[in-house]
Design a protein with these regions (language model features):
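Residues that mark the start of a beta-strand
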Residues: 1-2, 166
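Short glycine-aspartate micro-motif
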Residues: 2-6, 12-14, 43-45
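Short glycine-rich anion-binding loops that position phosphate/pyrophosphate groups of nucleotides
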Residues: 8-10, 137-138
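A cytosolic small-molecule/anion-sensing beta-strand core signal
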Residues: 17-18
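Structural signature of FAD isoalloxazine-binding scaffolds in flavoprotein oxidoreductases
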Residues: 28-31
């Protein structure tokens, strides 16, 4: 079993079991970004409160980073990207961390740890052999970000599972969506 989790504007997910993509009856499944993590948390785009996306998506990270920049806590990010969320991309976050914006490092670390909790839920439910994490955050900060996600996942999943899975970086980059869509279309054509 392989679980894929892709934090970006939202947080998408997928699961492949015995070579088959698991899909729901009426639509996709593995909407991991909408796991309820904080019942009294921020309003999510889905209409619920406290979903994982409100805590760990790149959009949530960018919003917290913009606040830090506005408050003067992230001068490098402020100079490079300002406080406009559309300018605060994964690469700008990585550059700000490299330049010494510790507030941005804390924001990203906090979000990565929340994503790790989501990974732990997936591990507890699916017992995957591999968890693939992809997207711009992983590409911009592969070691730091992935290490935080993995450490958090292992600390929050059930102890029997802690050493049973690998966390790896997605390798398809910008081609992942195209390849995934083609595979899904091929599978749909077989039915």
């Amino acid at each position: 079993c392989v679980v894929g989790i892709f934090p970006g504007t939202g947080i998408g997910g997928a699961c492949v079991y015995e070579g088959q993509l698991i899909i729901g009856k009426n639509s996709s499944c593995m909407e991991i970004g909408h796991l309820p993590m904080m019942p009294q948390g921020q309003l999510c785009g889905c209409g619920q409160r406290g979903c994982l996306e409100t805590l760990a998506s790149r959009l949530a990270i960018s919003a917290a980073a913009a606040t830090a920049a506005y408050r003067g806590e992230a001068p490098h990010l402020l100079e490079a990207a300002g406080t406009d969320l559309s300018n605060i991309r994964s690469s700008a976050l990585a550059d700000a961390i490299k330049a010494g914006d510790t507030a941005i490092e804390q924001v990203v670390r906090h979000a990565a740890r929340w994503l790790g909790r989501g990974v732990a839920v997936a591990v507890n439910l699916m017992a995957p052999d591999v968890v693939v994490i992809g997207g711009g955050l992983v590409e911009a900060m592969p070691g730091f970000y992935l290490d935080e996600v993995e450490e958090s996942a292992r600390s929050y999943c059930m102890s029997p599972y802690r050493k049973t899975f690998k966390v790896v970086k997605a390798e398809l980059g910008d081609n992942a969506v195209t390849i995934g869509a083609a595979a899904l279309a091929r599978e749909a054509g077989k039915k």
